[in-house]
């Protein structure tokens, strides 16, 4: 497991990496490279694994989707989505309920300080900071690309 700053990845960014979705995958690949170098810790919700499987099995096939998710599990810390997170998400007025679940899943880890997403305006600033992959990487001196 990687060390360093602990960041939460929204499902879209993980999918960019796993499915090599252009032009977004460059930034997603760079995030995973930092994790592989133990410069950051990537966190992903349990909910993302289900969503990713659903999408990846349509893009590829079920076996390849599972293989990609097994590799992903070796690179990330999985955050919880339980009763408390569902209750908190239901109590908010997010445009997208899945984003609310992601937000409260990220908050289960006290030292996650940012969600990396391509939909940063879907996350209320008063709950958690959200940045695009480009914004996050632009601030880092250890990103060599």
Question: Where would I find each of the regions flagged by the language model?
Answer:
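Short, well-structured N-terminal submotif of metal-dependent ribonuclease cores
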Residues: 1-44, 57-64, 125, 131, ...
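PIN-domain endoribonuclease scaffold, especially VapC-family toxins
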Residues: 6, 29-96, 100, 104-109
